[in-house]
Amino acid sequence: MLTFPLINDTSRKIIHIDMDAFFASVEVRDNPSLKGKPVVIARNPLQTGGRGVVSTCSYEARAFGIHSAMSAKEAYDLCPQAIFISGNYEKYTKVSKQVREIFKRYTDNIEAASIDEAYLDVTENKIGAQSAIKIAKLIQHDIFVELGLTCSAGVSYNKFLAKIASDYEKPHGLTLIMPDEALEFLAKLPVEKFHGVGKATVPKLHALGFFTGGDLQKADPVDLAERFGIYGWELFQKANGIHNSKVKNHRERKSVGKERTYGKLLYLPDDIKAELIKISKQVSESLKRHQLKGNIIILKLRYSDFTTLTKRKSMVENLDSPEDIAEAARQIFEEIDYDESLGVRLLGVTVSGFGVQKATLDMQ
């Protein structure tokens, strides 16, 4: 028989805050002459021989089709008049901490999803407000007045719906999805808008006739589970507005990684590979302390100009040995388009995908 929870907890009040074009907006705030112009956070490809990747860009740049993870060269081709800025990760981190301090005025139940987004559970809150919408508006006001930035907010009874709501109207939007509105809202939503559905999964879903949340709502959950494993169950639940994951201040460990910053830049590939061996040994030691193995290896490389490359590789077996981790990291490094002229200031190796092989369904 099938076993998975169909209980839908609609009692929580969850806010998802997503800073609007965060890095680019900070740069525009600090240099008002950039306002209204297409700003791209990446090194100018004319100065790097076409190298570099877009971290993010302003909404004016997005109007030209530019988006994050695009090559800087492609961004330039789409908009030659774009203003390219290398970016300042330390500054963005500082601003992110300032945003978090604003959150803390209303609740301590905060889960950072990334440097520019977070979930807040305001079911119980510090100002005794019954309305999550009121708190979301106050947060938007505080961030705009005190930091000169805008954010979009989504409000609903779970994290999945709050995240979708914050994406619905940007920039500086505020969207509420009530429990009795969730199914209708999700029914119209394209599957590619479901948080967690990647580019590789979309064509598979389309091939099966699943184009919207409504299609998934009518699906046979057994069939989804047989085709996609535990992910199929989760997708069926999400399409039906069910996502009972709590906002966690301290997340359950999902990865183990180590990073090193270098005062003296690394240039030679052999030097980088030697460092990856050292870092992999540290990661292995940490994995073994926590009795964990993972089948996803992630390499992070940051150039001297703060351009950051992140690439992952899925392995057949779960790993925890320093030799296996280092070999996987080396393979990833050799697959990236490494620019030896820039110099590397940071390297990182992370292992995730814990317990993937254990994620099986009870079907009898």
From Swiss-Prot:
Enzyme Commission number, as recorded: 2.7.7.7
Catalytic activity: DNA(n) + a 2'-deoxyribonucleoside 5'-triphosphate = DNA(n+1) + diphosphate
Site (Substrate discrimination): F23
The protein's enzyme class: transferase
Disulfide pairings: none
CDD domains in alphabetical order: PolY_Pol_IV_kappa
Binding residues for Mg(2+): D18, D116
GO molecular function: damaged DNA binding; DNA-directed DNA polymerase activity; magnesium ion binding
InterPro entries in the cross-refs: DNA/RNA_pol_sf, DNA_pol_Y-fam_lit_finger_sf, DNA_pol_Y-fam_little_finger, DNA_polymerase-Y, DNApol_IV, PolY_HhH_motif, Rev_trsase/Diguanyl_cyclase, UmuC
Active site positions, chain numbering: E117
One term under GO cellular component: cytosol
Domain of life: Bacteria
GO biological process: DNA-templated DNA replication; error-prone translesion synthesis; SOS response
Pfam families registered for this protein in UniProt: IMS (PF00817), IMS_C (PF11799), IMS_HHH (PF11798)
Domain UmuC: 14-198
CC cofactor note: Binds 2 magnesium ions per subunit.
Subcellular locations according to the entry: Cytoplasm
Keywords: Cytoplasm, DNA damage, DNA repair, DNA replication, DNA-binding, DNA-directed DNA polymerase, Magnesium, Metal-binding, Mutator protein, Nucleotidyltransferase, Transferase
PROSITE patterns assigned: UMUC
Cofactor field: Mg(2+)
Family membership: Belongs to the DNA polymerase type-Y family.
NCBIfam families: PRK02406.1 (NF002677)
Subunit record text: Monomer.
Function comment: Poorly processive, error-prone DNA polymerase involved in untargeted mutagenesis. Copies undamaged DNA at stalled replication forks, which arise in vivo from mismatched or misaligned primer ends. These misaligned primers can be extended by PolIV. Exhibits no 3'-5' exonuclease (proofreading) activity. May be involved in translesional synthesis, in conjunction with the beta clamp from PolIII.
Protein name, UniProt field: DNA polymerase IV
Gene, per the UniProt record: dinB
